[in-house]
Amino acid sequence: MSDTDYLTRAEAVLAAVERSVDAANDGDADIDLERNGSVLTLTFENGSKIIVNLQPPMKEVWIAAKAGGFHYRFVDGAWRDTRSGDEFFAALTGYATQQAGMPIAFSA
């Protein structure tokens, strides 16, 4: 994947996360979202955080959550965990739901 292709796909991930947080906040969720360059910080009511950031040199998107740190690469049309193969948005949904204590959905 070229650098340009990576940046286009990775920025689309950040935009989708932002849209999903907005949609969750339109419901019962209260998630504070802060963007600083290529880093998104999601802060939940209980003070816990999830950080999503881009890693251009490695062509990866990373998630840091209570559950741990996870690296995702674009493989076969989806961002996949480099260890487990889990899809990015499905995994982020699980981490956010766990930390928020309520269902939070993320999708592309």
From Swiss-Prot:
GO terms for cellular component: cytosol. SUPFAM superfamilies: Frataxin/Nqo15-like. Disulfide bonds: none annotated. CDD domains: Frataxin. One of its GO terms (molecular function) is ferric iron binding. Keywords: Iron, Metal-binding. InterPro entries: CyaY, Frataxin/CyaY, Frataxin/CyaY_sf, Frataxin_CS. Gene3D superfamilies: Frataxin/CyaY (3.30.920.10). GO terms for biological process: iron-sulfur cluster assembly. Pfam families: Frataxin_Cyay. Transmembrane segments: none annotated. Involved in iron-sulfur (Fe-S) cluster assembly. May act as a regulator of Fe-S biogenesis. Belongs to the frataxin family. This is Iron-sulfur cluster assembly protein CyaY. It comes from Burkholderia mallei (strain ATCC 23344). The gene is cyaY.
